[in-house]
UniProtKB/Swiss-Prot annotation:
Pathway involvement of the protein, from the record: Carbohydrate metabolism; pentose and glucuronate interconversion
This protein's encoding gene: uxaC
Family per similarity comment: Belongs to the metallo-dependent hydrolases superfamily. Uronate isomerase family.
EC number: 5.3.1.12
Broad class of enzyme this protein falls into: isomerase
UniProt name for this protein: Uronate isomerase
SUPFAM superfamilies, alphabetized: Metallo-dependent hydrolases
InterPro entries named among the record's database cross-references: Metal_Hydrolase (IPR032466), Uronate_isomerase (IPR003766)
GO biological process terms held by the UniProt record: D-galacturonate catabolic process; D-glucuronate catabolic process
Length: 467
């Protein structure tokens, strides 16, 4: 039997029935990812397996480094085939890491390759995959069609012109591609060398002059309006933790003015400015019926040496352990008091916070929007089988699992769509075990619609995207 077979990860007859009946054929709504919209607009055709699979993949780079592979074959200038060979030699060493599952699931689904990837099979895999990539079968557009992706939400800076999204909308592509408003740089008053060039770009994008806090906020709103006009209905924030030391408008303006003059905000000032801006962003989202996403808890760029050499997002990040409950509860409560709490999805990176988040979301359900505040799917280091189960169990135990928005790729790679399949198999295995243990009724009419909703329906209804 092939390693990746029809019943992969499905440990019971009931799980297999649930998956093949209710989950397998559901479309995909990838409501948070990092796909380059330029690649979609250009209908990129990938030259080889390296380009589509290893280019920019920090998950693989971390594994390769741990296997003794030099940086030249991760992010460096080694030839593409040599980098691929270094990965192929690494794969057998990743046993019990989710990379081993993902690698073989992706080879099977994209190229029909059944054999295990290792040093001995690498040349055959390279040749077979590249032969498919040389045809029109796996261009960016064809991949989205192949995996029945109804919509993709990219992650975009407020200063982005969204020209690629406009081109995609005009192309006739069946998959809708929407922007997501990610204004992280708007908080960087503690780093004027980053903040001020960004504000300068914001001036250009908003076609306005920015010298005061009021003008800054007006420019932010103009860009938020533009994203809305382009079909965007989600925002996203990558922050260590929520901010809750709310300053006055005057104090926020003072911190902004000093940053514009090149004076770095202190840690306390940064926290206050961030708290002020996160309220601004929450109000904007609520006014337009958007969904706010909070990605909490990543400790980034741990290796100063490697960050200086290679920059961000190259594989030097890990799980942080900041306290989350107090500031998060205070932030959500402040918006709720103003009747300005938008639909919200909270993703935590530290599994120690699972029950914190699973219980926190119950404090702010409004009795109008089902599942208004959501515990997001396992993120980054937690988007693997065990951590998916942890998240699902915490949400089930403390909340309304049936209203869960389900999976997203959170990926830069066009090869990541089988992660939705992976999630769905884990989901159906969970329900199957419960049924076979007598903990849930063996009733397809009861459980089947819940599985379908978690796979697609809940997200489709909740997010308000024009899909």
């Amino acid at each position: 039997m092939s390693f990746i077979h029809d019943d992969f990860l499905l440990s019971s007859k009931t799980a297999r029935r649930f998956y093949h009946t209710f989950a397998e054929d559901q479309p995909i709504l990838d409501y948070h990812c990092h796909l380059p919209p330029q690649d979609v607009a250009a209908n990129r055709q990938f030259k080889d397996l390296f380009e589509i699979w290893l280019e920019g993949d920090h998950y693989k780079w971390r594994a390769m480094r741990a296997n003794g592979v030099p940086e030249s074959h991760c992010t460096g200038n080694a030839p593409a085939y040599e980098k691929f060979m270094a990965w192929a030699k690494t794969v057998p060493a990743t046993l019990r890491n989710p990379l081993y599952h993902w690698t073989h699931l992706e080879l099977k689904r994209y190229f029909g390759i059944d054999e295990l990837l290792n040093e001995q099979s690498a040349a055959r895999v390279w040749e077979q995959a590249n032969a498919v990539l040389a045809t029109p079968e796996l261009t960016a557009h064809r991949i989205l069609e192949k995996f029945h992706v109804k919509a993709v939400c990219t992650t975009d800076d407020p200063t982005d012109d969204l020209a690629a999204h406009q081109a995609i909308a005009a192309s006739g592509l069946a998959t809708k591609v929407f922007p997501t408003f990610r204004p992280d740089k708007a908080l960087h008053v503690h780093a004027p060398e980053l903040f001020n060039p960004w504000v300068d770009r914001l001036q250009v994008a908003a076609d306005t002059h920015i010298s005061t806090m009021a003008e800054f906020l007006d420019a932010i709103k103009k860009r938020h309006d533009f994203f809305h006009a382009m079909g965007g209905r989600l925002s996203d924030h990558g922050i260590n933790h929520a901010f809750s030391d709310f300053p006055s408008e005057h104090e926020a303006a003072r911190i902004f003015g000093r940053a514009r003059c090149g004076h770095a905000a202190t840690s306390e000032e940064h926290g206050k400015f961030a708290a002020y801006m996160m309220l601004v962003f929450g109000r904007l989202d609520a006014e337009k019926g958007w969904t706010k996403q909070l990605h909490l808890g990543a400790r980034r760029n741990n290796s100063t040496r490697r960050f200086r050499e290679l920059g961000a997002d190259t594989g030097w990040d890990s799980i942080g352990d900041w306290p989350q409950a107090d500031a998060l509860g205070t932030y959500l409560d402040r918006l709720d008091l103003e009747n300005a709490l938008p639909k919200t999805v909270i993703y935590n990176l530290n599994p120690a916070d699972n029950y914190v988040i699973a219980t926190m979301i119950g404090n702010f359900q409004d009795g109008v929007t089902a599942g208004k505040v959501q515990f997001g799917s396992g993120w980054w280091f937690l988007d693997q089988k065990e951590a998916m189960q942890w998240q699902m169990n915490a949400l089930s135990n403390c909340g309304m699992f049936s209203k869960f928005l389900g999976m997203l790729t959170d990926s830069r790679s066009f090869m990541s769509y089988p992660r939705h399949e992976y999630f769905r198999r884990v989901l159906c295995d969970l329900f199957g075990r419960d049924v076979e243990n007598g903990e849930l009724p063996d009733n397809d009419e009861l459980i089947g619609p819940v599985i379908r909703d978690i796979c697609y329906g809940n997200a489709q209804r909740f997010l308000g995207l024009n899909v």
